[in-house]
């Protein structure tokens, strides 16, 4: 059984994230979506809310588990005996940054590899930052996020 982890802040989870999760769920026995608490970011949704939104978004995927974490990713990888780290890369800038993290994670986990998945073309422009910006300017994000996220955003707007 191959277990992979897909870490991120997912603030909020987007259809681009869902693309990576769904494709990973086909490729691997188990996918753990690890929702990170990042003290250097001011999130739109707190950690518990983000975990819940991801859970609601992946409920149809039987081999996907969602966890929240505020530890070093390498520690989570070692504790859960993860086989590989999944990262989505949209641009060459993403690739350069993720390559640095992959080298560090490989060192800190005694060899666990990072696998880079580009998004399908349909979602190559979508990011949580863009979704938040559109939402904060009262734009329509309904085609960019799962239904549970849209409901949470609409509730937040009231």
Curated annotation (Swiss-Prot):
- What does the record give as its pathway? Cofactor biosynthesis; coenzyme A biosynthesis; CoA from (R)-pantothenate: step 4/5
What Gene Ontology biological process does one annotation of this record name?
coenzyme A biosynthetic process
Q: Cross-referenced Gene3D superfamilies, in alphabetical order?
A: HUPs (3.40.50.620)
Q: Under the GO molecular function aspect, what terms does this record hold?
A: ATP binding; pantetheine-phosphate adenylyltransferase activity
Note the InterPro entries from the entry. Cyt_trans-like (IPR004821), PPAT (IPR001980), Rossmann-like_a/b/a_fold (IPR014729)
List keywords of the entry alphabetically. Answer: ATP-binding, Coenzyme A biosynthesis, Cytoplasm, Magnesium, Nucleotide-binding, Nucleotidyltransferase, Transferase
Subcellular location(s): the record lists: Cytoplasm
Any one GO cellular component localisation term in the record: cytoplasm
What the protein does? Reversibly transfers an adenylyl group from ATP to 4'-phosphopantetheine, yielding dephospho-CoA (dPCoA) and pyrophosphate.
HAMAP family (alphabetical): PPAT_bact
Q: How does it assemble?
A: Homohexamer.
Spell out the protein name for this chain.
Phosphopantetheine adenylyltransferase
Species, as recorded: Histophilus somni (strain 129Pt)
